[in-house]
A protein has these predicted regions:
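Hydrophobic face of amphipathic alpha-helices that form TPR/SEL1-like repeat modules
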Residues: 1-28, 114
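Residue-level signal for inorganic ion chemistry
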Residues: 11, 30, 66, 88, ...
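A short acidic/small-residue loop/turn micro-motif
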Residues: 15-22, 38-42, 258
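Conserved C-terminal structural/oligomerization subdomain of aldehyde/semialdehyde dehydrogenase
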Residues: 29-35, 216, 307, 353, ...
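Short, well-ordered beta-strand elements within core beta-sheets of diverse protein domains
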Residues: 33-39, 54-60, 142, 252-255, ...
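Long amphipathic alpha-helix in the N-terminal Rossmann-like dinucleotide-binding domain
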Residues: 49, 67, 71-82, 94-120
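ALDH superfamily catalytic-core signature
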Residues: 226-370, 433
Length: 472
């Protein structure tokens, strides 16, 4: 059994005087594989002070030095990618191929893209009679989730380093091993001593202190909408910048001109990737009402081909969800939908057949779901899809926008012009047209409405960590 200490301050892993531990549980077996030593409040204060003391040195790093640090981190990730993939599979149950080809690769791509941006980004521009400087915002607190652990941490860290900011990161306690490897990699880079600090423990204990702290200039948070609201309320006392990437209930509009035998399986796969544990997952599938019967048959047949099981097997497409809390929450959503007479066409409550342990959820689809039903409105964060019928495209757009969230949207159409016109009417931070996955990494990512504010990735992600200063 591992005992993990992830309290990394001023260039060293340090002990916590008051020992509090968090059990690390393998979601595929429910066995405890390790214990995380939680960061004490005293050491959290030390981490923030360390970042504050390193603020000026980080800000004064040349662009070449910032690029070199990012290149060193990139090399470290690539060198340890097999190890990291196995760790992510252990921590959150992601199928090993997904860990390698998505979890790790997306983080690598973000690093490469940020390095490329620094080749041409202008931190100083001359306007008509004045100069504009883009300067580091200062001490940044980065709070990252468990669902895409390495991708989310590298997205934020790469932008903060590129901007010249010092960092205190609080990764998810469920991802202690991958976080430790990342800290080791950054420690082997030329990052200024104290410029990168990590605290690890229960979010509800550390989060309020981070949110209210006077020495922290910015918080970048990815997680649930309710926690994001709590952070923003507490952060308002010090008027610090808060960038929030929160929940979603994304719609996927299937137009009536497509090959359903291709479009429906692709839509289901997109929804169920990472066991449905993605804030941008297209969990509402909007289809023409006159084709619903055909679509149901295709959906049932496809779900029955999805291999659920051991995440270390190359054959597995769907692993467990991350923990018992998530499993029970998803089961409750499914049960409530069944009890309220939603049309269950495949899946349902309990584990898949022949799986007796682990936090495995049956891939589940409901059809003819009323657009205002909780199963079509609440973020479930599991492999659960709601199929909703529409009368015409304007009706589809109305249904897509009938959500408190606005993170992402998807369109499948054989007519690019029609798809683009639809996309302009959808209230979401991004629209993905005829693609499996997010598409271009540099594209900005962030939400409308209760899906958050601010943007990550590419130039827009870098600029979240910069202040604008005019010299006249």
């Amino acid at each position: 059994m591992f005992k993990i200490n992830n309290t990394f301050i001023n260039g060293s892993f340090i002990q916590n005087n008051q020992k509090t531990y968090f059990d690390l549980i393998n979601p595929s077996s429910e066995d405890i594989y390790g214990k995380l030593e939680c960061t004490s409040i005293q050491n959290l204060e030390k981490a923030i002070l360390s970042a504050c003391n390193a603020e000026e040195e980080c800000a004064n790093l040349s662009i070449d030095n910032r690029k070199n640090i990012l290149l060193q981190i990139l090399d470290g990730i690539i060198e340890r990618r097999e190890e990291l993939a196995e760790i992510i599979t252990l921590e959150m149950g992601a199928p090993i191929n997904l860990s390698k080809n998505a979890h790790i690769q997306m983080g690598i791509d973000h690093l490469k893209n940020t390095i490329k941006i620094l080749d041409n980004y202008e931190f100083e521009t001359f306007e008509d009679g004045y100069k504009v400087l883009r300067v580091p915002i200062g001490v940044t607190a980065l709070i990252t989730p468990w669902n895409w652990p390495l991708n989310q941490t590298l997205t934020k860290i790469s932008s903060a380093i590129a901007a010249g900011c010092s960092i205190v990161i609080k990764p998810s306690e469920f991802c202690a091993l991958s976080s430790k490897v990342l800290a080791e990699i950054i420690n082997n880079s030329d990052m200024p001593r104290g410029g990168f600090n990590m605290v690890n423990g229960i979010g509800s204990e550390l989060g309020p202190i981070i949110s209210e702290h006077k020495m922290i200039n910015m918080i970048s948070f990815t997680g649930s909408t309710q926690v994001g609201i709590n952070i923003q309320e507490r952060a308002a006392k010090t008027v610090k910048r808060v960038s929030l990437e929160l929940g979603g209930k994304s719609a996927h509009i299937i137009c009536d001109d497509v090959d359903l035998n291709k479009a429906i399986p692709n839509a289901i796969n997109q929804c169920f990737i990472n066991s449905g544990q993605s804030c941008s997952a297209p969990t509402r599938l909007l289809v023409p009402e006159d084709k619903i019967n055909e679509i149901k048959k295709i959906a049932i047949n496809h779900v029955n081909t999805i291999k659920t099981g051991d995440p270390l097997s190359n054959e597995t497409a769907l692993g467990p969800v991350v923990n018992a809390k998530q499993f029970n929450n998803i089961q409750n959503h499914i049960k409530n939908a069944i009890d309220s007479s939603c049309e269950l066409i495949v899946g349902g409550i309990d584990r898949p057949q022949n799986i007796n342990k682990g936090f495995y959820v049956k891939p589940t689809i409901f059809a003819n779901v009323p657009e205002n039903h909780p199963i079509a409105q609440e973020e479930i964060f599991g492999p659960v899809l709601s199929i909703i019928t529409y009368k015409d495209i304007e009706n589809a757009i109305s249904i897509a926008n009938n959500s408190k969230y606005g993170l992402s949207s998807y369109i499948t159409s054989n007519n690019p012009e029609v798809a683009e016109q639809i996309s302009k009417k959808i209230k979401a931070g991004q629209t993905i047209i005829n693609k499996i996955g997010r598409g271009a990494v540099p594209a900005p990512f962030g939400g409308f409405k209760m899906s958050g504010n601010g943007r990550e990735h590419g130039v827009f992600g870098l600029e979240e960590y910069l202040e604008i200063k005019a010299i006249i």
